[in-house]
Each structure stands twice: as structure tokens, then as C-alpha cells.
Amino acid sequence: MEIKTSAIVLQTIKYGDSQLIVDFFTEKLGRLSFMVRVPKSSKGKMKRQLFQPLMVLNLEFDYRPKSNLQRLRDVSIQIPFSDIPFSPYKLGISMFLAELLSYATRHEQANGALYLFIQDSIEWLDHAKGAIANFHIVFMIQLSFHFGFMPNIESGMSGDYFDLVDGCFAAHVPSHVHYLNKEDSMRLVSLFRLDYKTMHLYTMSRMERNRCVEVILEYYKLHLPDFPEMKSFAVLQELFA
């Protein structure tokens, strides 16, 4: 079956001297992996540069449902980046988000709303001119909505401790260890009220920001099966001092 779809690059693994295994989140079919042969010369369309983290591409291929690795027939850039490849901060964020999405969408089928959210977020990051230190935090919070486990911050009126397991506030300390103290809980409430346009208004120290990311990643681990440690988090910890 011939398929034409837009797709977002999540992960690229070198396979031999002239092939790549590329994981995509596609608009029409959800998560797919491809074996891509790249030329050693400058000729040909399948250039390695196309398959960088979060690149938004147009794909054309013959879909084989029983195959674990699809084969591309044609590829082109749908959204050319103007700033992400040239900004160390945006590049660091894009690597972090690509790794996050690579784990979070492993079993994801076609999901138009999720795909549109990710694509719009990538475009926003590329065009952003102001402070972006909170971008990945806002992204992770909003992404949790699409996976069905967005925390209930409205329950904050009835308790001081945010329960990471139940995704809501508790009046008393939960019986398990996965909860936040009052200070972290109130910061979480503030962050959940932000969007990309207002995120620059909320200032945090490097330590506070890293703590927020740690908390949200713990929340993901509790609600997404087999969610691993994020290797790229170490890069972000150093970027926004």
C-alpha cells in the first residue's frame, strides 16, 4: 500500500557503512521504523542530514504491515529549520524532546491531535526569539494530556502533597514514596498554568528547573511502562545555568 505522510524524526542509528535505521512518528500511521540507504557521495535524496532529531519530513513508501522495517521510496523536508541547528540551547532541547518522544510513542498508533501538537511545538521552538529555558518543561506537561495522565491541579485546593501515582493532591502524606512536598507541589501548580507564550514570565534557578524536570520524568516513569532514564537530561542540566 502506497503511503504519503508527514513524519517527525525521533532517533537515527547507524547500520553498517551506508545504512541508517530511523524511527519516525508519522501523521498517518503513528510510530514506524525505516531502513534507509544513504549514498556516500553528495548525489541522491537520502542524505544523512535529513534525519536529525525532530526534523519534519514528507515520506513516500510502500507500507508493509508485517515488516518491522519499512523502506523509503522518497523523502523531502516539510518544515525547514531556521534556528534549531544553529542554537546550542535549541539543539539541546530538541535532542531531549526527541529522546522523550522516542520512548513515549513506542506503541503509539495514528494520533492526529498528538502529531499536530508535536509539530506545532517544534515550529514554535524553531521560531522562538525570547527566553526558552522552560520550553521542555511546558512541552512535557502538555504532552501528558495527550497520553491521558495529565495531573489534576484543580485538586490542589484540598491538599498540600502532590501524589505522583494518582496524579492529584492529597491532604496527608501518601503511604508510598512517590509524592512531592508542599514547595515542589506549589511550583508544579504554577508550571501547569504556563504555555509557550507565558513561560518566560516564570523564573527559576538552575537547581529548581532541574528539580522540576526530575519530578516530571519520575511522573512519566510511573505512568508509561518501561520508561527509562533519559540520557540527554545531563546535557540540559548544564545548558540553562
Question: Each PLM stretch: what is its role?
Answer:
Residues 1-241:
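Non-catalytic alpha-helical scaffolds and adjoining flexible linkers that form interface surfaces
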